[in-house]
Regions:
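Hydrophobic helical membrane-anchoring modules
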Residues: 1-2, 20, 28, 53, ...
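Short, conserved active-site loop motifs that form the nucleotide-linked donor/cofactor pocket
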Residues: 2, 33, 58-60
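Short, well-formed alpha-helical segments that are part of the catalytic scaffolds
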Residues: 11-26
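Donor nucleotide-sugar binding loop of glycosyltransferases
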Residues: 11-15, 42, 103
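Short beta-strand/loop segment that forms part of the nucleotide-sugar
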Residues: 31-41, 62-64
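A conserved acidic beta->alpha catalytic loop
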Residues: 39-48, 100
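Acceptor/aglycone-binding surface of glycosyltransferases and processive sugar-polymer synthases
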Residues: 60-81, 90-92, 103-187, 220-226
Length: 226
């Protein structure tokens, strides 16, 4: 089972298209899956957009009316997947952004790497001419600090050059080990890049095998300041 986890806040403009693409992709790439969405107190039409998809695909929505932030939304999704799995060694969590910057077309290769034995596969965003200038500058700065000692020891992950992205697949037994070590303590309430680094480092420490996969992000549908 693959649990596709989407932390969501005010994604009404993109979440429907993303779910449609995920559903279409799994019709061709046959794997058992379930989409878990954490609706983090959205104020737009996110919840209404989700409703019809629950009738045509395996979709479960959690969340509430109080905003908890990205880090705690991811934490809640990981715990939900951990509670639902029956085979943690065989099952996996896929974390994606709900704003469509993470394309479903990369899912088959992520899954193949996982099925080949990787406990964690991190999607590393390819920076090219199509990447917006603010994102290119940020990516250059982030890669610079991962190479700079002593910052490398604080944010770096062996074999991963971009620990700041949110697109990854993780074996659920590894997620379970991380949650057990963390007990009831959730991810810190920090900004998205910091939360992604913290989670990637925690998972990498528990994983036996870590891989990275170059991916092309989509910036043409919705560009955020972050």
């Amino acid at each position: 089972m693959l649990y596709i986890c989407l932390p969501t806040h005010d994604e009404g403009a993109t979440i429907g298209v993303l779910l449609w693409r995920i559903r279409a992709m799994f019709q061709e790439f046959s794997r058992e899956y379930e989409v878990l969405v954490y609706d983090d107190a959205s104020t737009d039409a996110t919840r209404e957009t989700l409703e019809p998809y629950a009738k045509v695909m395996p979709l479960h929505v959690i969340g509430g009316t109080t905003r908890v932030g990205y880090a705690r939304a991811v934490d809640a999704l990981l715990r939900a997947a951990n509670e639902r799995t029956r085979y943690p060694r065989r099952d996996a969590v896929v974390l994606m952004q709900a704003d469509f910057t993470d394309g479903p077309e990369h899912l088959p290769e992520l899954v193949k790497r996982f099925e080949g034995g990787a406990d964690l596969v991190v999607g590393e965003r390819v920076v090219d001419a199509a990447t917006p200038e603010p994102v290119r500058k940020l990516a250059g700065w982030l890669r610079w600090i991962t190479r700079l000692w002593p910052l490398r020891s604080a944010v770096g992950v062996t074999g991963v050059t971009d620990p700041f992205g949110g697109y990854r697949i993780v074996r659920l037994s590894t997620v379970r080990d991380v949650l057990k070590a963390r007990d009831a303590r959730p991810l810190a309430d920090v900004r998205v890049p910091s939360a992604n680094v913290e989670l990637t480092r925690e998972i990498a420490r528990a994983a036996r095998r870590v891989e990275a996969l170059p991916i092309t992000a989509r910036w043409d549908l919705r560009l955020r300041d972050t």
